Amino acid sequence: MKPAKTPLKNVTIPKLERTFNKCLVWFYAFPTTKIGLTDLAVSINSSKTATKEVVESLIQEQFLNREIIGKAWLLSSNQKHSFFSTKKIPYNLQNVYESGIIEAVYKNTPSPRAIILFGSYRWGTDLAESDIDIAVEVIDNHDLQIVPLGVIQRLGYRKNVPVNLHIFSRNKIEKNLFVNIANGIVLDGFLEVRV
């Protein structure tokens, strides 16, 4: 008969919820990266026990894929999972508001009519190297200008995320680009869309 296993520490619900959210956020930041269970636990600053429990639930949910190599797990995200739109987009939007981007736009661009989040960060398809694209409509009659707003030193688990402003006036923007912007999320102001 095998000796009884030493009982493991209990993992409380709040700890699991924090680990669950940290795990999601890590894979939002690095959706194409494969990582082992131990490295993931270290990266999200969580116990291996709690991380394993959360990872197993995310595998059942089909948010994560698991390759077993010997005794090790290699984890990757399923980028087609609904969490990348239902949970990642609101997470990205919260990050934009908390990062001070809107305030920085007002300091750099006098009297914008509308400030719009568009591109991959808006759709939740951003990768580890992606920048954040912000469209700013102005009343002037100038051609499109793309200018760097700055770099967010830390955005979740990502570091040094560039933010670019696409400053445009209605009369001088290419139609397909305007359609892309119009399908973005208006962060502040009012974007009038004409048919």
Model-derived features with residue positions:
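Catalytic core of pol beta-like nucleotidyltransferases
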Residues: 2-111, 123-129, 138-195
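Short helix-loop-helix/strand-helix junction enriched in hydrophobic and basic residues
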Residues: 114-121
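Short, well-ordered beta-strand segments
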Residues: 133-135
